[in-house]
Amino acid sequence: MGKIIGIDLGTTNSCVYIMEGKDPKCITNPEGGRTTPSVVGFTDKERLVGDIAKRQAVTNPERTVFAIKRLMGRKADAPEVARWKEHSPYQIVAGPNGDAYVEIEGRKYSPAEVSAMVLAKLKADAEAYLGETVTEAVITVPAYFNDSQRQSTKDAGRIAGLDVKRIINEPTAASLAYGFDKKANEKIAVFDLGGGTFDISILEVGDNVVEVRATNGDTFLGGEDFDQRVINYLVEEFRRENGIDLSRDRMALQRLKEAAEKAKKDLSTSMETEINLPFITADQTGPKHLMIKLSRAKLEKLVEDLVERTIEPCRKALSDAGLSASEVDEVVLVGGMTRMPLVQKKVADFFGKEPNRSMNPDEVVSMGAAIQGGILAGDVKDVLLLDVTPLSLGIETLGGVFTRLIERNTTIPTKKSQTFTTAADNQPSVSIHVMQGERPMASDNMTLGRFELTGIPAAPRGMPQIEVSFDIDANGIVNVSAKDLGTGKEQSIRITASSGLSEDEIQNLVKEAEAHADEDKKKKELIEARNQADSLIYTTEKSLSDLGDKLEADLKKEIEDKTAALKTAMEGSDVDAIKKATDELSQASHKLAEKLYAQQQAGAQGAAGAEAGAGDAGAKASQDEDVVDADYTEVKN
């Protein structure tokens, strides 16, 4: 079995860890970063992922996709998607089944497909670090993700060429990293406020057991919303001062987004920052510059209600866990937004204790995912992880009522069955409408799927016995079956994301991703071949220049011809042709190198001979200089 990597597939940034022996290790990207922006950019020639995609977003806003996680498993007409559309520079459209897709230059991409592009980059970075192929991963999701969102995440992994061994909740992964090697029993709260989602989980950690007691959250609350508040403020201030509305200028909005994100980070450590964006726009009077000072107090006022929205889920999670805030031993902060002083203060006020800041909030989730990978691979022993399902599961029954079979915060994996009957005489079939949610009426909850149990023998209403069974696996993904106990006839459904991809679509996307990986590999080979050729041309031309007229005309012409042939090959895209022309010039340039070496040797010998001649003359002069005229007196006896 190869290495199982742990991936935190984040809204804003993603991170990948691996177990090296018993220690989790962060895999840095080629740019040297420990996290990679979850951004994909499409240009005329190529597809960009990560830092390079984020850097070109200002000049290419309509074709740069960020925060795609917010669209995972959602319908295009969902209220949250409608809100996101208002601020998104890229186009969000309805895909098959009415699910939310993004459209780039006429091509529709599912959120799973775009996420797969980010995962493929993380996979490639891990392979470059390990020097071996990576095929298995543990991927994290927000604890409050529903079944559709979990299934979409798993599909993204498959498209990227990864066998997703486990989908694990982000707060659970964080607690696994926090509780790793800890023996003392503690009740901990993991407060996870990231780029796009918020989760709160109450867990018991200790003696190598991590048990989730309860979880709650908001899958549409995070740093992106905080950034948007700052952007709105900057747009309004600029409009007030200059009478120009920047909200209609997508390029300006992208610059404002970058500035808002930076200002928000700066104000976690400073009391005031200046946002300075020269040439943000222009009118008939000339270019306009944006210069606005933003204080921490002003930022806190802008986002106070967003921070307040995190408190109610905390109350619900504690209630479900049967604990009071004072019974929680530690509050662990996860997600970049928890660096904000106002967030830390709200958490401290609610739980009555200072939060634990010992873990890196950007990396702790992927670290936990890698530990889970180590557990699955058998490299990490004696660690038991007990997770829960975040939302209640059930079916629609007579009168449009939602009948729960599995309550929220039930430990998974789990299986539960309940017997139902028919509502009419001689009813030949029953429709099973599978749902997830907490509302009493079916219409207010989320549909996971529908299926029919047919062939029920004619009988008065209330007589047939239909057993409905729910089975949730360790990934939190649902299977449902219905069985007529009278005939033994059974029908089952594996719930795939109702707004997700069919098996055929996934297989096609897997093939497309593999083809794209081959294209990327060929592109890399072409760049490397051109670089090698360019380097050889430079050294060859320099050697020709150094030798000047001392080179035979035939050899000089041969080298010049082969150099020209290589330059022509470099203009094309045939890697083999470039390599062949490079080899031919390399062989010819060996003769050139020999000539140059011989010239240098001759020069060195000439210099040595001249030095030797000078030495002899010097020695003679030196001897002559040693002769001294002396006065003397002749003594006679």
Curated annotation (Swiss-Prot):
GO MF annotation, one: unfolded protein binding
Entry annotated with the keyword ATP-binding: yes
Expression induction: By stress conditions e.g. heat shock.
Pfam families: HSP70
Keyword set, alphabetical order: ATP-binding, Chaperone, Nucleotide-binding, Phosphoprotein, Stress response
Biased composition (Acidic residues): 624-637
Keyword Signal: no
Function noted in UniProt: Acts as a chaperone.
PANTHER family the UniProt entry points to: HEAT SHOCK PROTEIN 70KDA
Family of this protein: Belongs to the heat shock protein 70 family.
NCBIfam families named among the record's database cross-references: PRK00290.1 (NF001413), PRK05183.1 (NF003520), prok_dnaK (TIGR02350)
The name this protein goes by in its record: Chaperone protein DnaK
Lineage of the organism: Bacteria, Pseudomonadati, Thermodesulfobacteriota, Desulfovibrionia, Desulfovibrionales
Gene: dnaK
